[in-house]
From Swiss-Prot:
Gene this chain is encoded by: G
Family: Belongs to the pneumoviruses glycoprotein G family.
Protein name listed in UniProt: Major surface glycoprotein G
Polar residues bias locations: 133-155, 250-282
One Pfam assignment: Glycoprotein_G
Organism from which the protein derives: Human respiratory syncytial virus A (strain rsb642)
Gene Ontology biological process terms from the UniProt entry: symbiont entry into host cell; virion attachment to host cell
């Protein structure tokens, strides 16, 4: 009955609140118009009354809300008192829990486990309950623990018959019967057993960084060999001539041609030393004057 009364009062308060708001709006609009002084005074009085009634309605509304809160707290307290006053009988009757009826003071708390079937894992929630035995109450609050089992994602199992569905990019030799061109093109298929395929990854060779150095030209200084220049000595050309000795007679003095022939036979050496025959000849006869050389003009 108390709940119904609270609901009715709340509805009436809401209705009065709305009507008072509308009246305030209408009175403010009328006050803005140029009316007589008496009408303006009455409108202002109405506005004051409406505003005070709104304040009163708000106070009542807040009080009713507080009353609702207190009523819910009293209901909760009544429920807890009923739980405290009534002791559970199945605790003393269940031998699996290890509790005998002779010592009921050992009963302190009841832990219930609730399994949630909607979640993939299992959630264990520990709830604390209070039990009153011989005017003694003990409470144990334990945090709620949630444990979830992680699903192991298994890889999809591959069928073992993959070997039978291989697509060949070449002509197998089993097809060729007596065709020579087919035997020239075909390739023999090795006998493979279905199993694990081993894939060999190409190993990358380490790149060796080589720095090329410019070869410097090796300059070898050629040792100068001291060369000794041989002083050329003048070669003396000695021409041996058959000297025909002719007796100097009186005819030689008479004939000057004979004297010239004699001078040619007795030739001098390269050093210009006259022969003794020439000296003797020239000594006997005076030298003839030689003709002067032809000088160009």
């Amino acid at each position: 009955m108390s709940k119904n009364k609270d609901q009715r009062t709340a509805k009436t308060l809401e209705r009065t609140w709305d009507t008072l708001n509308h009246l305030l709006f209408i009175s403010s609009c009328l006050y803005k118009l140029n009316l007589k002084s008496v009408a303006q005074i009455t409108l202002s009085i109405l506005a004051m009354i409406i505003s005070t009634s709104l304040i009163i309605a708000a106070i009542i509304f807040i009080a009713s809300a507080n009353h609702r809160v207190t009523s819910t707290t009293t209901i909760i307290q009544d429920a807890t008192n009923q739980i405290k006053n009534t002791t559970p009988t199945y605790l003393t009757q269940n031998p699996q829990l290890g509790i005998s009826p002779s010592n009921p003071s050992e009963i302190t708390s009841l832990i219930t486990t609730i399994l949630d079937p909607t979640t993939p894992g299992v959630k264990l929630t520990l709830q604390s309950t209070t039990v009153r035995i011989k005017n003694t109450t003990t409470t144990q609050a334990q945090p709620n623990k949630s444990t979830t089992k992680q699903r192991q994602n298994k890889p999809p199992s591959k069928p073992n018959n993959d070997f039978h569905f291989e697509v060949f990019n070449f002509v197998p030799c089993s097809i060729c019967s007596n065709n020579p061109t087919c035997w020239a093109i075909c390739k023999r298929i090795p006998n493979k057993k279905p199993g694990k395929r081993t894939t060999t990854k190409p190993t990358k060779k380490p790149t060796l960084k080589t720095t090329k150095k410019d070869p410097k030209p090796q300059t070898t200084k050629s040792e100068e060999v001291p060369t000794t220049k041989l002083t050329e000595e003048p070669t003396i050309n000695t021409t041996k001539t058959n000297i025909i000795t002719t007796p100097l007679t009186s005819n030689t003095a008479r004939n000057p041609e004979l004297t010239s022939q004699m001078e040619t036979f007795h030739s001098t050496s390269s050093e210009g030393n006259p022969s003794p025959s020439q000296v003797s000849i020239t000594s006997e006869y005076p030298p003839q004057p030689s003709s002067p050389p032809n000088t160009p003009r």
